[in-house]
Amino acid sequence: MLKMHPNINKYEGVPVTDRIVLAYSGGLDTSVAIGWIGEATGAEVIAVAVDVGQGGESLETVRQRALGCGAVEAYVADARDEFANEYCMPTLKANALYQGHYPLVSAISRPVIVKHLVKAAREFGATTVAHGCTGKGNDQVRFEVGIQTLGPDLKCIAPVRDLALTRDKAIEYAERNNLPIETTKKNPYSIDQNVWGRAVETGYLEDIWNAPTKDIYDYTATPEFPPAPDEAVISFRAGVPVALDGVLLSPLQVIQELNRRAGAQGVGRIDVVEDRLVGIKSREIYEAPGAMTLITAHKHLEDVTIEREQARFKATVSQRWAELVYDGQWFSPLKRSLDVFIDDTQKYVSGDIRVVLHAGVASVNGRRTDTGLYDFNLATYDTGDTFDQSQARGFIELWGLSAKTATTRDERVAASGENA
């Protein structure tokens, strides 16, 4: 019999006959949450673990731990290809960087986890979904808004937030009940990772003057001492990477290989203070070698293939898209509408981009496409160019006519002393 912490309170409104599905990571907090939830509600707990390329332990190891911690069932899903195809690729097409920096590493993994949580709830007859988020972060919103959208009839609970269950209490509970989980406090950071990148926060980093120490990095090598430059050719079809150096690969494989190659060069390190959805600013360290390399290459191919006015408007759409996804609105009507526009812009984003990876930078030095708008004969300054320069004078006169007319008006009003 698991020993209940004396400070734990019962959830109201969750009948003891209910089954509850729990978003399970295999870590301390969610392992302990299995017992906490059972004690607080009397319900059976089904642990749901979703592999989005976070690495580490096998799904079977995670499944066995969940069962060892008291779950009656353990639903595990290898969602790596699904995550790459349906979540990372739309993010790439949008060139999505929240506040110009963050490639939405954690934000885009939550919707796929939500999808499997709701699927598991239906499969096992659960009426409630639980997650291990605190009340201070963005993920609580992402999980609960997503669950409300995909499963409006499902209830949501968050034991760490709702019952004020601290890490010290979690360690005490795990040790007292001999749960099969490591309980040391050796890692002071909060870490979330998947194939699109890695996020590190809290601890020493909360003082925003402190420089990150080398020990917090895992996906990237120190860029100050790089190996020889690594040149890669990334091939795209309709905005999606389909090959690397001429070898056909799936999106997942492209991301994984660029994580390895760009990571070895220290590409993709981001140190930023960002605005959280809950109204506070937070210092975050990100590593996204594959994601940042792909976004860089993709943007350069767009520069060649997308018409100017469409490209300008897409930049605005991409910013709003990133904000929606960061704010937990992956399944919202507006985000779906923006997806339609973004997909339309990608019709001609096909071709090859040559990228040099070196010393923390992914720099583009070559572009090749059959669907581009770059016309050598129009662009060249050499003899034989097809650009008719005689049309420039009239174009300039008309282009500046509005400003010229306004200036003439301003000077006339100023000279007469009239009020505008």
Swiss-Prot record:
GO terms for biological process: argininosuccinate metabolic process; L-arginine biosynthetic process; urea cycle. It comes from the Bacteria. It is an enzyme of class 6 (ligase). The keyword ATP-binding applies. Keywords: Amino-acid biosynthesis, Arginine biosynthesis, ATP-binding, Cytoplasm, Ligase, Nucleotide-binding. GO terms for molecular function: argininosuccinate synthase activity; ATP binding. ATP binds at residues 23-31, 132. It catalyses: L-citrulline + L-aspartate + ATP = 2-(N(omega)-L-arginino)succinate + AMP + diphosphate + H(+). This is Argininosuccinate synthase. It comes from Renibacterium salmoninarum (strain ATCC 33209 / DSM 20767 / JCM 11484 / NBRC 15589 / NCIMB 2235).
